[in-house]
Structures are given as C-alpha cells and as structure tokens.
C-alpha cells in the first residue's frame, strides 16, 4: 500500500546485517567476500523482489560504509561503522543533482567558506534510501573540486524531500535539499581529503558496480532461462510441447545463451575482485554487459511465456523483473555512458603500457622522454601486429587499440568506435572464462555467438578508421576471423534443449536462484518429465 517493505522485513534485514555485508567483523559487520555479496543479491533478485534487492545492494555498494572503510578517520569509523552494522543507522549517498547525472564533474552543489565553516547549498535527487537515511554522504564542490561530507539526518537546515517512484518498485528513493553549515570535521576522511572526492568515488565505485547490478542482471537471465525453459517443456499447443517448435526454439536459445554468458562471467569477475582487483574499466564493462544481457533474456522470456507473462499477480514469475530492468540499466553509470565512454575511452589511458607516459611527456615538453615512449609505442604496435597474424585475438585487440589512437584526440569523442571497442574488450573477457569450461554443446554454441559479435564489432571499427589504419586492422582481422559462423536452426534447437531438458547448466542455475511458488511448480514438471501436465493445471493450483 505504501510501496515500501513491511516492518518485519526491515527488522529482519537489520537484525541479520544485510546492510553490513562489506563492513569488517571488527566493526560488527559480516565481512563478506565479493562472491558472497553477489550470491546474496542474486538470490534475492531472482525471487522477483527487485525493491528488496536494491535496498540491500545500495548500502553494500557505493556509500558511506564503503567510503568510511577506505578513507574515514579512525574516530569516524569508530562512531559510524558499528551503527551501520547493527542497522541503527541507514546510509545513503547524495551525488546526482538537477544538472549532473552521469557527469558528476558538472556538480553545482557547492560550498562557500565562512571562517572555519562551509556554507553548503544542495539540491540532490534520485537518491536511493534518502527518505529513511540516518547517515548521509554528500558530494559537494569546494573551490572547484569535489569533496565528500558526512552529515546526520537531523542536521540543521537539511531537508529530506518527497519520495520518487522508480517504476513502482518498493524501495526508498528521493531528494535531499537545503542550506547547511559544515565544519572540517564533517569531511569524510578529515581535512586531508579536502578536494579529493572524485578520486575517492572512482576508486570505491569500481568494486560495488561490478557486484550489485550485475547480480541483478544475472539473476534476471537465469530466472528467465529456468522459467521459460520449464514453461516451454510443459506448455502444449497443436499437440506438442512448444519447446519443440522451431520458432520458439530460437528465442529459447537466445535466453540460454545470455544466461550462460552471465552466469559464467559473474564467476570470473567475482574471482578477480576476490583477488583484490578493482579496475574501473572492467566494472563498467561488466555492469553494462550483464544488465543488458539480462534485459534481452527477460524480453525473450516474456515472448515465450506470452499470456502467462503479462497477467500480473502473485504467480507471475517475470513481470516485476521485466518492469524493473530499466532501473538496472540506468543506475551506477547508465549503460550508454558505460559502453561509449567509460570502458574503452577511459580504460585505454589507464591500461595502456605506454600511452600515459607518452601524453605526460608531451604535456611536460620533455623531448627525450617523448622519443623514448614513442619508440616503445611503435614497438608495441609492431609486436602485436605480428602476434595478431598468428591468430592471437588479444594481440588483435591491442593492435586495433593503437590504430584507434591514430585518430588523435578525436578518439575520445568517437563514441561509435569506443562503444564497439568496449564490446570487443567485453567479449575477450567473457571468452577467457568460458573457454576454460569443459567442452559441451552449450559452451561451443556460446563461443560461436560471441565470435560473431566480436567479428561485427571489428568490421564496424575498421570502417571508421583512417584509410591505412583501417586496412591494417582489416588485414589482421581477416586472419583471425575467416568468416561469420552460421547459426543454424539445429544449433538453436541444441542450445534450447539445455534449458528445456535436464542439464548440468539448469542444475547450476537452480542452486543460484530462489525457487518457490509458480516457478517451483514449473520446475517440478520439468524435473519429473511431466509433459502431460499442462500449464493451465499448474495455474489452477
């Protein structure tokens, strides 16, 4: 009625420390690994409770808890982390404003110095958990640089505004406004962190962005696969299971493909995070890939389940997830931004072995250093050209990246190229995990599909490069990709059977998702090979 979680649910979440998964045990938290956090959010999201999943994921992603652990002063940690762990305080973080969304650098919420105090005028919106938050992190510009502040809800002049209504999902989201006075003690991390807020945000966002929303996207894909596969096996039309119809097998194969990619890449990325990696390009890539693939899977599952998918009610498995996917696509870095700017456009400068040094040498007007790193850059290009001729696709990506740099400063504005290079990078990462799996038909089908996606991305890039660079990329691309692999109806039928018939793949998904109610009934029919039991009989229960 209030579009909110019930009081017993809130009580359960606080008592069982769902908001403290990332907080160390020493401060009363659970100290969970990235993999454990991912599994918890996946399980919740797979039940279709997207509002609950978002409520749990936000305090464990970018917010006061994560920032306090990395940058907070010892008094700040001692004061707030135990209260966040116990649920006594609910956190939120205010970054988005009226004129800044994906581009946080356009932030207009600013502070004026008044003696030893800061007079802050703020107008934040779209802030998850703001309506109920007790501890609020704020991104504010001080002397043109972003600084992070911590304030409590009852701070004089702070106004928690009305709630937003994000796609009708029951999670708290709203505005933060007001004119308030703050001291240096309110700076997260103390005075030494004044003006360093942007760096703090980028470093902390990398980990949470690779866990929370990808868990939601992966859950969406896996539930879509299990539900549509079980339904297609059970549902009969024209005297046969619809899963045996060629027209239905095509979307079923698409669903199986997206779920297979998401499930296996999630395992790979969580392993990287567990090893201490937190690269922003990798997290941006995985966020946009996992949520986009989850959306594709849900859309196709809605088509397969047809009337059963569009009638809302407690037995509808997909509707809530379907309606909420735009939330996953949008928050923590909109997918368009993540794909076209952040992954390759931002990642190339950070990851290239010579580019940063070359740019620094130009800016500092150091001729000797410039010539040295230019030589290294040329050597890097020639070396990867040679390796690419031996069908090394990682070398092909590195060589093509250097060819993109022939565009000069224009490469960062060439978002068409940048987005396709991001896709290629994504596919290389995903293939590195999938190629290591035991060989079976689903693995082979998935690699064929990824092969075709990668081939098309290279074709798009080479056409937009300067003439010589484009021809060189086309040459080594043809060595690596002789042709597009045809996906036949028989291939689709084989892939679809991985979710309509008993398989190790489905068994894996069943261990990762929540199975109850209507989905439980469908899975029971699937497991027991009960073709004769129609979906209408399941509905009647």
Positions of PLM-derived features:
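Internal helix-loop-helix
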Residues: 15-78, 82, 86, 127-132, ...
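C-terminal substrate/ligand-recognition segments
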Residues: 393-394, 414-431
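Gly/Pro-rich turn-and-neighbor structural signature
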Residues: 4-11, 15, 72-82, 87, ...
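Glycine-rich phosphate/cofactor-binding loops in nucleotide/flavin-utilizing enzymes
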Residues: 309-390, 471-540
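C-terminal helix-coil-helix/basic helical segment that borders enzyme active sites and/or dimer interfaces
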Residues: 259-289, 301-310, 408, 429-473
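Catalytic nucleotidyl-transfer cores of nucleotide-processing enzymes
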Residues: 132-135, 159-179, 184
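A glycine-rich, basic-preceded beta-loop-alpha segment at the flavin cofactor/substrate interface
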Residues: 157, 176-209, 226-243, 265-267, ...
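A short core secondary-structure module
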Residues: 117, 121-161
